[in-house]
């Protein structure tokens, strides 16, 4: 799966590790990884105490490079949208998700993230009662999700998409 703007989320944890790829946007990810990638796959691993660790790091480096190529290609292959997403963090995440799905990326799960619900004041405005931080956040989510669903429908992909909203709030 792909997770946006937050790492180590519960939905992608296994007993051994986190199985998701963290993504802010495909272009930035691709530029960072390809700009720093050093192809050392064919170089011999030294027979030292750190040899296994070096082999692991090289494999992770290569896999990051390979995945960034695939993600970037999907983002670039997507048709241009005629819809306007809200210019918000969650709106941008929905827009990127739509691009990746439309571009043919076969990732089965996308985990978007909207922060800001941990409020202690101004959660609901005093007058009128439909203002405040909570209302603004839910409105942003609703507007962004609406555009995403309209785009999936326009692309003939709506029957392949299931949207679930969850909330995790707790004190440990």
Q: Which residues fall in each region the model found?
A:
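Feature for exported/extracytoplasmic and membrane-associated proteins, marking the mature portion
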Residues: 1-143, 147-154
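Metal-dependent active-site segment of extracytoplasmic phospho-/sulfohydrolases and closely related
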Residues: 145, 149-172
